[in-house]
Amino acid sequence: MENRMVTPFDVEDDKEQYSLRPTTLKEYIGQKKVKANLDIFIKAAKKRNESLDHVLFYGPPGLGKTTLANIIANEMTGNLKVTSGPAIEKAGDLAAILTSLTDYDVLFIDEIHRLNRSIEEILYPAMEDYALDIVIGKGAAAKSIRLDLPKFTLIGATTRVGLLTSPLRDRFGMLCAMEFYTDEELMEIVVRSAAILNVNICREAAFEIGKRSRGTPRIANRLLKRVRDYCDVKHDGDIDLQGAKAALDLLEVDKEGLDKIDNKILEAIIFNFKGGPVGLETLAYFIGEELDTIEDVYEPYLIQKGFIMRTPRGRVASEKAYNHFGVTKKEEKDNQVSIFNK
């Protein structure tokens, strides 16, 4: 998965993308509802000279959760401290982070659903009362001391919101669902990024890159850089529609934004399991991927694009999936699925 051109996760090659990130809400493209709400909440907090209420961003990876955390810190004129659920192993780790914050700072915890439950409980008074409870001593001699914390904002990010405990989820004042971007929004992101990279690109080429980016800005920027490389070598450096298509075809990212692994999943359901239903564990074993990887990385896009459907009995290929491979689905009298070449 790490070598996939269309993986939504951050990879080593994406470091250049940090310079492409917008720093204000005005520059931010997409997520209109989230953006509109944040704009109001930030302005209201600044008007009252208060810290912003705690925010939870949830949705598939690569949709801008970290970028929005940076923007919130900038808008609130605070510092951003970044960590992740798995990185906070001990209560002392979290206590050290919390006591290092100042007013209006933003603490961003990625993969917050992976926080240890005992560590999570330390966050409860920190989020509600801006206080940290520390236990000194052991046994009968133990006593609790409460330390006041600065007025900070906690921003949590998760791809698995259902795994968050209710007590933690309920302490967030704002819950923001991150959605896949439209092709038009991704085109605008590609145009903006190309300008920052000093690359000339026509809007048709930018749209083609956006269309194949699986609704994800991180992928769009990654594909833009690879198309830039191709056009630097094969063309005069400018990116036109022909060059973009040739580069993307060479990268084996098809017109629907699917790569080899996506097609492998669809082929397995259609040709090996007669269109489904097939259980997720069986499917994961068959294609050699982790169950969580399929559920978190591949499925959201395939479902969003209408290629597969979730049912109580398992995953089922849609008519669109059959059309993608140029075959038709015919329901026989015994309800078995047969496949005929067109």
From Swiss-Prot:
DNA binds at residues 310, 315. GO terms for cellular component: cytoplasm; Holliday junction resolvase complex. Mg(2+) binds at residue 66. This is Holliday junction branch migration complex subunit RuvB. It is found in: Cytoplasm. Keywords: ATP-binding, Cytoplasm, DNA damage, DNA recombination, DNA repair, DNA-binding, Hydrolase, Nucleotide-binding. Its main location: cytoplasm. InterPro entries: AAA+_ATPase, AAA_lid_4, DNA_helicase_Holl-junc_RuvB, P-loop_NTPase, RuvB-like_N, RuvB_C, WH-like_DNA-bd_sf, WH_DNA-bd_sf. ATP binds at residues 20-21, 62, 65-67, 128-130, 171, 181, 218. GO terms for biological process: DNA recombination; DNA repair. Has 3 domains, the large (RuvB-L) and small ATPase (RuvB-S) domains and the C-terminal head (RuvB-H) domain. The head domain binds DNA, while the ATPase domains jointly bind ATP, ADP or are empty depending on the state of the subunit in the translocation cycle. During a single DNA translocation step the structure of each domain remains the same, but their relative positions change. The keyword DNA damage applies. Residues 1-181 are annotated as: Large ATPase domain (RuvB-L). Pfam families: AAA_lid_4 (PF17864), RuvB_C (PF05491), RuvB_N (PF05496). One of its GO terms (molecular function) is four-way junction DNA binding. It comes from the Bacteria. Residues 182-252 are annotated as: Small ATPAse domain (RuvB-S). Belongs to the RuvB family. The RuvA-RuvB-RuvC complex processes Holliday junction (HJ) DNA during genetic recombination and DNA repair, while the RuvA-RuvB complex plays an important role in the rescue of blocked DNA replication forks via replication fork reversal (RFR). RuvA specifically binds to HJ cruciform DNA, conferring on it an open structure. The RuvB hexamer acts as an ATP-dependent pump, pulling dsDNA into and through the RuvAB complex. RuvB forms 2 homohexamers on either side of HJ DNA bound by 1 or 2 RuvA tetramers; 4 subunits per hexamer contact DNA at a time. The keyword Lipoprotein does not apply. It catalyses: ATP + H2O = ADP + phosphate + H(+). Residues 255-342 are annotated as: Head domain (RuvB-H). Homohexamer. Forms an RuvA(8)-RuvB(12)-Holliday junction (HJ) complex. HJ DNA is sandwiched between 2 RuvA tetramers; dsDNA enters through RuvA and exits via RuvB. An RuvB hexamer assembles on each DNA strand where it exits the tetramer. Each RuvB hexamer is contacted by two RuvA subunits (via domain III) on 2 adjacent RuvB subunits; this complex drives branch migration. In the full resolvosome a probable DNA-RuvA(4)-RuvB(12)-RuvC(2) complex forms which resolves the HJ. Its EC number is 3.6.4.-.
